[in-house]
Amino acid sequence: GIPCGESCVYIPCTVTALLGCSCKDKVCYKN
């Protein structure tokens, strides 16, 4: 539920995905 500061509208989460973030509602979130 915490925004990671990366969007995933056109491409998936990249850098933040390594930190455990996943795409939700076009934004990368963690918990």
Swiss-Prot record:
Pfam families for the chain: Cyclotide
Disulphide bond pairs: C4-C21, C8-C23, C13-C28
Post-translational events: Contains 3 disulfide bonds. This is a cyclic peptide.
Keywords: Disulfide bond, Knottin, Plant defense
Keyword Cytoplasm: no
GO terms of biological process kind: defense response
Tissue specificity annotation: Expressed in seed, root and nodule but not in flower, stem, shoot, leaf and pod (at protein level).
Numbered residues of crosslink Cyclopeptide (Gly-Asn): G1-N31
Function: Probably participates in a plant defense mechanism.
Domains as described in the record: The presence of a 'disulfide through disulfide knot' structurally defines this protein as a knottin.
Family: Belongs to the cyclotide family. Bracelet subfamily.
Name this polypeptide is given: Cliotide T10
Species annotation: Clitoria ternatea (Butterfly pea)
Organism lineage string: Eukaryota, Viridiplantae, Streptophyta, Embryophyta, Tracheophyta
